[in-house]
Design a protein with these regions (language model features):
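Substrate-binding groove/exosite segments of carbohydrate-active enzymes
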Residues: 257-298
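Membrane-interacting alpha-helical segments
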Residues: 89-104, 185-189, 279-282, 287
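A eukaryote-biased signal for short, well-structured alpha-helical docking elements
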Residues: 29-31, 39-40, 53-108
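Polysaccharide-binding surfaces and accessory modules of carbohydrate-active proteins
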Residues: 2-58, 104-107, 111-219, 228, ...
Length: 298
C-alpha cells in the first residue's frame, strides 16, 4: 500500500492527513483538469483533487494560490477513479468513483465497488464549489467516513514557477467553526488573503486541515455533501447547498451567452468542426473582464 506524501503546510499549522492509496489507483489521476471564472482558476488532477503542491496544482485567485492541497477519501483511503470529464462548455468537472476494498487489521470494513461517489466541481465569482453524492449499492446498511483534507500556502504564481523569495509574510491562526475553517495570510504588501472552506451539512469532526463526515447509509441509500471554498470572502453568504445549483446555472448561462456572440465555423469535416467548437469554448473560458473590456488570460 502506497501512502501519498504530505503537502507543505504553513508554519504553526498541522499537516493534513495523508490518505492511503491502493496499488490499483489509476495513473489517469495525474492528468490535469482546469476550471476558471474571471480572476479565479483551479488546476486539478483528474479526480478533482489538489494533490501535488510542489507542482502547478492549486486553487488560484488573483495570482495567489488559495488552496495548495485538497483531497477526498473514504475511511482514510482514496476512492478509485472511474471517469473524469470537463463539460463541453468548460463550466464544470464531473468525476465518478468507486471504493476499493477497505480493511482494518482484522476484517474487511467495506467490500470493493459497493460505494459510488459522484463529484461535481465548478468556479463562480471567486468561489470553488463542490457537490459529492455518496450512494450505497449494497443490500445492507453501511457506515463509513467521508474525509476531506486541505491546506493553503498562499504562494504567488512566480513562486509556483520556481522563484525563491528570501522573505515572506505571516500566517494567521486558523479560525474554526462548526461548519467551516478559515485560513489567512498577510503578505509583505500588507494585504491579507483568506481561504474559507465551508461544509454543508456540518461535518462530524473539523479541525485546522481536516473535516470528516460519519455517514450511515441504508440499503441503496445515499447522502450529499456540499463544499464551498471562498477566496477573500467571509460571512453573510448562502449555504453551499443552496448556492451550488444557482451558481452552476449562472456559470453555464454566462458561458453560453458569451460563446453565442462568437463567429460560428462549420465545414463538411466533423473532426475540424469539433476542434473549432472546442477552441471557441476554451477561448471563452479564458476571457476575463477588465476595465478595457474582455481579455483572454493565458
Amino acid at each position: 500500500m502506497q501512502i501519498i506524501a504530505q503537502p507543505p503546510t504553513a508554519p504553526g499549522t498541522q499537516a493534513p492527513p495523508s490518505f492511503a492509496v491502493t496499488a490499483s489507483v489509476s495513473l489517469q489521476t495525474r492528468r490535469l483538469r482546469t476550471l476558471k471564472h474571471e480572476d479565479t482558476f483551479a488546476v486539478l488532477n483528474a479526480a478533482g483533487d489538489i494533490a501535488h503542491a510542489s507542482e502547478a496544482e492549486g486553487l488560484y485567485h488573483r495570482d495567489t494560490r488559495h488552496l495548495s492541497y485538497f483531497a477526498v477519501g473514504i475511511n482514510g483511503t482514496r476512492p478509485l477513479l472511474l471517469s473524469s470529464m470537463v463539460r463541453d462548455d468548460n463550466s464544470a468537472l464531473t468525476c465518478e468513483f468507486s471504493n476499493p476494498e477497505i480493511r482494518d487489521e482484522t476484517q474487511v470494513q467495506l467490500e470493493q465497488d459497493i460505494i459510488h461517489l459522484s463529484r461535481a466541481e465548478f468556479i463562480w465569482q471567486g468561489v470553488f464549489y463542490q457537490r459529492i453524492a455518496v450512494r450505497n449499492f449494497s443490500n445492507s446498511r453501511k457506515r463509513l467516513k467521508l474525509n476531506f483534507a486541505f491546506a493553503a500556502d498562499f504562494v504567488d504564481l512566480f513562486e509556483v514557477r520556481g522563484i525563491h523569495r528570501s522573505a515572506r509574510g505571516h500566517f494567521h491562526p486558523p479560525v474554526i467553526s462548526s461548519s467551516y475553517v478559515q485560513l489567512a495570510y498577510t503578505g509583505l504588501d500588507n494585504q491579507t488573503r483568506s481561504t474559507q472552506i465551508c461544509f454543508d451539512p456540518q461535518p462530524s469532526r473539523i479541525d485546522t486541515n481536516h473535516a470528516e463526515f460519519a455517514l450511515d447509509l441504508e440499503e441503496r441509500g445515499y447522502s450529499v455533501v456540499h463544499v464551498a471554498v471562498r477566496c477573500n470572502q467571509s460571512g453573510g453568504r448562502r449555504r453551499p447547498s443552496s448556492a451550488f445549483l444557482s451558481g452552476l446555472r449562472a456559470s453555464r448561462n454566462a458561458l453560453h451567452q458569451a460563446a453565442s456572440q462568437a463567429v460560428s465555423i462549420e465545414t463538411s469535416n466533423d473532426i475540424y468542426n469539433e476542434a473549432a467548437r472546442r477552441a471557441i469554448a476554451d477561448l471563452y473560458m479564458l476571457m476575463t473582464h477588465m476595465p478595457e473590456g474582455l481579455v483572454p488570460y493565458a
